[in-house]
Amino acid sequence: MIAYENIEFFICLVNVLGNNMYNILFFIFLSIAIPFLLFLAWKQHLKTKEIRSYLLKEGYNIIFNGEGNSYLAFNISNATFRAGNLTSNDYFQASISYIHDYRWEWKEVEAKKINNIFIIYISNIDFPSQKLFYRNNKSLAEIDWAKLQAIFHQPYEIQNDVMQDNNNTHYDFFISHAKEDKDTFVRPLVDELNRLGVIIWYDEQTLEVGDSLRRNIDLGLRKANYGIVILSHNFLNKKWTQYELDSLINRAVYDDNKIILPIWHNINAQEVSKYSHYLADKMALQTSLYSVKEIARELAEIAYRRR
């Protein structure tokens, strides 16, 4: 009987000590974790304050807070923006012209806008967009939306020079193609390149009524960094495309950069070689192997590196 009572006492003692030990360990954990988390929060606050001060010092006076600690800041005086993180010194900087679209999305419940999101599209493959979240704060979203619109619409002199001076427009690509290929490939490619913010000389969106076709094509050829040549059976049978190709080849002879970027559209190497050994020797993207989006992405990366 005594032995049984001793066992019961021992079990109770273990339970009491076990519970106390758990409480002690939990208290020790909290006493370490809470100060550590407070320290990290304070350190993050100081870093955020430091980066904000630096942005203001650099002239980026309009700052939008994004998802997490991300930000989008604008320097109106030189028409540039920065996108980065308030807890890191890394950022992407470019001309405002690199932002090629923006929109406001929200869900509406009982006539109230909730989950407000601004999406800003940037012409950079590694940094394609920035999202600004406002949740249920409709008033703040409306104020910032007005600010965002003002950035792109106010007629200050420098932004006009960067974004609206058509006489000084420099193109990433001149697209040489046969009109018969517009619907099947060219127009979808141009739409995708436009979405990525690439600046293109393309007859449908560059020429206006009354323009001289020959003079404008010559201007586009001179002002483009690259010529995209969409080789197809239709292309090979055209005289006008031959004129454009000759102009591009003449430029390529005197330029160290790869001026001509061929795309083979429903055509093979043997057929290209019969038309031009020069083009047949060049690395080409083929529509039989890649989708329009994949081809546009490859071309956009080339354009961004050259800028």
From Swiss-Prot:
Q: Which Pfam families match?
A: TIR_2
One GO biological-process annotation of the entry reads: signal transduction
Specify the TIR domain's residue ranges.
169-303
Q: How does it sit in the membrane?
A: Single-pass membrane protein
Task: Give me the Gene Ontology terms describing cellular component.
Answer: extracellular region; membrane
Look up what happens after changing E244A: Loss of NAD(+) hydrolase activity
- InterPro entries, alphabetically? TIR_dom (IPR000157), Toll_tir_struct_dom_sf (IPR035897)
The protein's annotated catalytic reaction(s) are:
NAD(+) + H2O = ADP-D-ribose + nicotinamide + H(+); NADP(+) + H2O = ADP-D-ribose 2'-phosphate + nicotinamide + H(+)
Q: Superkingdom, according to UniProt?
A: Bacteria
Name where it mostly resides: secreted
For this UniProt record, give its keywords in alphabetical order, as a comma-separated list. Hydrolase, Membrane, NAD, Secreted, Transmembrane, Transmembrane helix, Virulence
Give residues annotated as binding NAD(+).
A178, K179, E208
User: So what EC number does this one have?
Assistant: 3.2.2.6, 3.2.2.-
Q: Where is the active site?
A: E244
Gene Ontology MF annotations: NAD+ nucleosidase activity; NAD+ nucleosidase activity, cyclic ADP-ribose generating; NADP+ nucleosidase activity
- Keyword hit for Transmembrane helix: yes
What sections of the protein cross the membrane? 22-42
Quote the function comment for this protein.
Virulence factor that suppresses host Toll-like receptor (TLR)-mediated cytokine production upon infection, thereby increasing bacterial burden in the urinary tract and promoting renal tissue damage. Acts as a NAD(+) hydrolase (NADase) by catalyzing cleavage of NAD(+) into ADP-D-ribose (ADPR) and nicotinamide. Also able to hydrolyze NADP(+), but not other NAD(+)-related molecules.
* Assembly behavior: Interacts with host MYD88. Interacts with host TLR4.
What does UniProt say about this protein's domains?
The TIR domain mediates NAD(+) hydrolase (NADase) activity. Self-association of TIR domains is required for NADase activity.
**Protein name in UniProt:** NAD(+) hydrolase TcpC
Q: What is the lineage of its organism?
A: Bacteria, Pseudomonadati, Pseudomonadota, Gammaproteobacteria, Enterobacterales
